[in-house]
Amino acid sequence: MTSKVNRYIFHKIVCAVRDLPRTFRRLPTPRLIMTLLVKNEEELLEKNLLFHKAMGVDAFIVTDNNSADGTYGIIEKYRRKGWVVDVIRETATGYEQKEWVDRMIWRAKTSFGADWVINADADEFWYAPSGSLKKELSKSRANVLTCEVRSMYPEEDKPFWQWSKAVRPVTDLEAYDLSLYSLFERQNRKVIHRTDGYLQISMGNHKVNLLAELI
């Protein structure tokens, strides 16, 4: 196993070196793929796919980790439409998030021609003020963009895209008996990154290791 992992790492480094000449060029029409790691997300997954397709995502790669609700049926629906280009049914009972997302990124790069990748959860909706994530990426020579995360306060009788109240983080959660994982916790930034020069994503998709970085 160690030998196999070392070969994989070496292969990624070799590919990253080959990528260097084109790493920081502007791409007028970048191919943008979103990876999604999901489990029991039937309530949100379809909304997520529709929202991001409208925002300019070209295709989705989805890993389903033992969903027991209607999640896989939604994945299959959009696979048949051609939106989901790769589906991985992960049956492991542990949570190897970094490994599973890395696998999707590598497939996005090597099998589906992704220039940029967004690694998302089903409850994350990536928004660009212009209305097009691809348009924003086409302007950039950077190969990694660090993005703020805002928790939105749910508003009754409104679809999520009309929610207008952002949550202000609470600095002393214990004083209000709030969970460390509540929407009132300060959210860590996440990254959008190119596939050229890619080496490794971090746990939680908060950072990415690239052979050369221009932020």
Question: Where is each model-derived feature located?
Answer:
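Short acidic/polar active-site loop segments enriched in Thr and Asp
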Residues: 58, 115, 143
